[in-house]
Amino acid sequence: MSLSEPKPHAPTPDTAQQRTPVTLKALARMAREGTPFACLAAYDATTARWLERGGVHCILAGDSAAEVILGLPRTAEMPLEVSIALTAAVKRGAPNTVIMADLPFGSYHESDEQAVRTATRYIREARADIVKLEADASFSSTVAHVTRAGIPVCAHVGSLPQRAALTSGYTSAGRSADAAIEIIKDALALEAAGATMLLIEAVPPLVTEALLARTRIPIIGIGAGTAAHGQILVVNDLLGLTDAPPRFAEPAEALGARIQAAGQTWANRVKERNIGGQAYTMPAEQADLFRNRLAHLDETTRDKPSS
């Protein structure tokens, strides 16, 4: 099978256009009914369009773009303006999918008012459906203010990538009884503050199951077992584009190797002057006219004295 040949089961643009829009209410209904929903973090319109066609219910325009798109060393370095632009691109690519904005580090920490201003920009400028922020119980007031402004909030608990600098790198969470209890307390406080949804990251499945039994809002898991209402991965990890993916991220494809092979094929084609495809043509009479005019141009240029 060639790189350009679609797999037999791949959705076509015609069938993709028939998709019913997914909403936050639809995700809540799926959670109540015990139907898992699929989420992925993605960062551009083209990828978002294909994910929507593939049936993904929610796309997070994650601050992980700092690393996988911008090449920065940490998610905490994600620029706000770039994040808003990428979120808007994802929304344009997948208009019938729930789009979750990821508030960057420093864009909501100064005050509740700053958080409302930042969240409002994502809703207005990027047309996001919901905003996500990394939080513990101390951010309950922030969640309450943003929610009171009419903006749905997904509270991110467990392992918090934006705080990696405090933990000397990305790490799991909730692996001791005390740590697990703190995560449960955080989540309950954030739900009480008005969070529409929770995302729990890199915790033992036991912690996720305990949280599910004590909350009434949808929970998305990443590296948190299989029990959560929804599951999310970074699309680069799913596609095999990451050199060292997290232990919980099993690739569904090996696109990194295929992209590398395609690059090698193109380099060889260019070297051999055999780039493929079809060249544009010129009608014979126009080609003759062009040659005549080109000869005249050459003669005129040749006779022109040099300065």
Q: In which residue ranges do the predicted regions lie?
A:
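Alpha/beta enzyme core
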Residues: 2-307
